């Protein structure tokens, strides 16, 4: 089973979401749990392999506006961003 690794400030973003927006936090937890149980490149959140300058990373939908940006190997799922869409400044 894989483990989650929160890179940079993503743990802070996770905790802020948990405190400030319970509904969005619950929506985030569903794909996280799904990725831990099965293939992180499939399942909930419409997984999408990113291209160009984000090549090697994946995206899953949390809401219409928010995304989870991550990559994975056989042991870990690395979380790089939680929140806004990856093409927004």
Predicted features along the sequence, with ranges:
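Enriched for short, Lys/Arg-rich terminal
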Residues: 1-3, 11-26, 44, 59-89
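A short, surface-exposed loop/turn module that caps and links secondary-structure elements
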Residues: 34-62
């Amino acid at each position: 089973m894989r483990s989650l690794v929160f890179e940079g400030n993503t743990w802070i973003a996770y905790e802020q979401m948990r405190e400030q927006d319970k509904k969005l936090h619950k929506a985030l937890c569903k794909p996280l749990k799904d990725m831990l149980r099965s293939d992180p490149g499939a399942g909930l959140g419409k997984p999408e392999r990113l291209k160009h300058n984000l090549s090697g990373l994946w995206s899953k939908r949390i809401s219409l506006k928010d995304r989870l940006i991550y990559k994975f190997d056989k042991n870990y799922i690395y979380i790089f961003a939680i929140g806004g869409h990856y093409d927004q400044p």
